[in-house]
Amino acid sequence: MQQTSSAFSHVTYLAAEIGPRPCGSQNELKALQYCENQLKSVGYKTELQSFKTTQSFSWSYFIIVLVAILGALLSWVKVDSAVALGLWAVLLFIGENTTLSPLVSRIIPKKTSHNLIAKLTEGKPKIVISAHADSAKSGLMFHPRLAKNFRLGFLISFWSLVAIPIIAIIILVAPALKSPLLYIELVPALVLAYEAFQLAERELNGTWVCGANDNASGVSVALEAARKLASANAPVWVVITGAEEAGLFGMNHLIRTHLVDLISAYFINIDNVGKGQLCYTTKEGMLFGIRCSQQLTRLAENCAKSLPNYKSVKPCEFRVMSNDSWIPLIRGLPTITLIALENGVPVNWHWPTDTVENVDVENIETTIKLVESMCYSLLNK
């Protein structure tokens, strides 16, 4: 298929003409303003809501990892303090990763980001179509040879974090074992030191990527699906979020400020659909998995069967990284993500090769048809 569709023109404008779109940057705002103009032109009423965000998740986790390493070192001189510090690091990590209590992010310097909310009608929506406009920063942890093992590395780091206070507690209750346990505790501490190096390297040496697949492709699908739904004058919100890559700040702000309106809405999130095996998620979550709405997964399966190339759409569990869908999902709202994967991760994920030339327009067109079919099925219920 020739790369000439209106969907592909959105990808080109966002990823090539605007280029990298860091969280809270002018380029991110330009992308949102472009989307606003596109949606207004087909009859949507729009609103830009602002909020504060960090520019990256890396420094938050860097601080947490340092707290845990300090806890391991304290085991040599003051074990009770090591236990307290180690447990505190675990709680901070869980709070940050689940977004339920991101205490560390609150102390990181902030920028202003925005969400774009577009509505066809007043009142509560039945459907929310979402995609994030910002793009990410590269780093060695996202090198193509390492990215496929990202979740494994994440779990090793988490359990290393957990191991430090556990070992310190054992030292407290069994002092005779202190000497060998202190050396054993150095193993998780070294694992976390490597994690700290990766996080710092990303911030100090990484580059902001163009984000053609992640996530100009998803925004393109949202805009084109919105255009196709415009004539229905239906209770649909199209939400283009900011600051997803920093820690889901945009979607978090949307849910916090509009929960009453969104409590009965279906969420269809679109992320990284520009290359790879197109999938609909059945479970998401990095630390613990939450099943996506069975109603939406069945709907995605049935709607995919109506597509000419339906065999190219598969169910999947996506546990590699949290995306915007995590925010409504953890709050019990019916949610699903459409995403394309290769070896279990998005293609060219957070890497400089995430450019327009590496996006497959056929993937995008298939996703548009799937979103349109799902929305009309929900509206006709």
Regions found by a protein language model. Give the residues of each.
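Short beta-strand element of the alpha/beta-hydrolase
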Residues: 126-131
